[in-house]
Amino acid sequence: MDFELEPTLEELIKQDTLKWIFVGGKGGVGKTTTSSSIAVQLALQHPEDEFLLISTDPAHNLSDAFCQKFGKDARKVEGLSNLSCMEIDPEAAMSDLQQQAQQYNNDPNDPLKSMMNDMTGSIPGIDEALSFMEVLKHIKNQKVTESDTKDKVSYRTIIFDTAPTGHTLRFLQLPTTLQKLLGKFQQLSGKLGPMMSMLGGGAQGQQDMFAKLNEVQKNVEEVNEQFTNPDLTTFVCVCISEFLSLYETERMIQELMSYKMDVNSIVVNQLLFADDDENPCKRCVARWKMQKKYLDQMAELYEDYHLVKMPLLGSEIRGVDNLKRFSQFLIKPYDPKVDRAIITDLKEQ
């Protein structure tokens, strides 16, 4: 390349058009800290706009990161009035789905109802599907263009703190999968309806279900268009400087590219920067040597990506104040000679 991209997320933070930012990677690499830091910086840099951070990871950590309890409904972050958080609960969504299915009719022998109950209880990846349907609600109500109706919520950007790689890839594959599945289901609906009636299924319940499926299909098509538009959606990969994490990051990037999703930023967490320690321990020096080896490989492999290097901290990053201090290194490269005091002097929560 003729130029080197800035090793920061400053361009992403300042971009005006982004509506959806996904943050993902291998388990234990600091996804929640990174997604929370991105959300905090967005809120700080754009105080006049509203932002929403959503956790789609069944093992929710947003409440721990902000030292504040969040649930399935968006709640304002204390200390940042223009940032809200929520944690999607697949079990609660499953319960709501089953209750909605029961509303169609109360006949326990209805084969359609029995089929729906079996499906919701046994489909592989149902957690991701239910999480996706919850996300659909917010995307449907998100104002994307100025011509959108005024009753839509005008979040400037929604940030997703995703589950570990495998769950996330299944989650992101759902728009395409559902689009194909619903299309085939619609083709069968003309034949399926009379067949269900012959088996004793309620006609009104079937009509309601097919109407609901048509609505879902339209929403899924809209999401597919937005998720593959680089002006509206991007994915930030998070990793640590080790072989397994690097390998999984490359696998994820290849998958994301196959989904036609934009990805041009990688955050590398937990770096020691031992070269600048006055009295480094032998273990730290050895580990930093290993980290530098994989950093060099990343620099060569991802020369056309924003490669952001984040330091290992002396304590956990919890609470808004600590997130503000840590997140500044997403937009300004960390300098161990100048910034070491910032990362070793975090407030205990």
Swiss-Prot record:
Its EC number is 3.6.-.-. It is an enzyme of class 3 (hydrolase). ATP binds at K26, G27, G28, V29, G30, K31, T32, T33, E242, N269. Keywords: ATP-binding, Cytoplasm, Endoplasmic reticulum, Golgi apparatus, Hydrolase, Metal-binding, Nucleotide-binding, Transport, Zinc. Zn(2+) binds at C281, C284. InterPro entries: Anion-transp_ATPase-like_dom, ATPase_ArsA/GET3, ATPase_ArsA/GET3_euk, P-loop_NTPase. It holds the Pfam family ArsA_ATPase. It is found in: Cytoplasm; Endoplasmic reticulum; Golgi apparatus. The active site is at D57. GO terms for molecular function: ATP binding; ATP hydrolysis activity; metal ion binding. GO terms for cellular component: GET complex; Golgi apparatus. Its main location: cytoplasm. GO terms for biological process: tail-anchored membrane protein insertion into ER membrane. Homodimer. Component of the Golgi to ER traffic (GET) complex, which is composed of GET1, GET2 and GET3. Within the complex, GET1 and GET2 form a heterotetramer which is stabilized by phosphatidylinositol binding and which binds to the GET3 homodimer. Interacts with the chloride channel protein GEF1. Belongs to the arsA ATPase family. ATPase required for the post-translational delivery of tail-anchored (TA) proteins to the endoplasmic reticulum. Recognizes and selectively binds the transmembrane domain of TA proteins in the cytosol. This complex then targets to the endoplasmic reticulum by membrane-bound receptors GET1 and GET2, where the tail-anchored protein is released for insertion. This process is regulated by ATP binding and hydrolysis. ATP binding drives the homodimer towards the closed dimer state, facilitating recognition of newly synthesized TA membrane proteins. ATP hydrolysis is required for insertion. HAMAP family: Asna1_Get3. This is ATPase GET3. It comes from Candida tropicalis (strain ATCC MYA-3404 / T1) (Yeast).
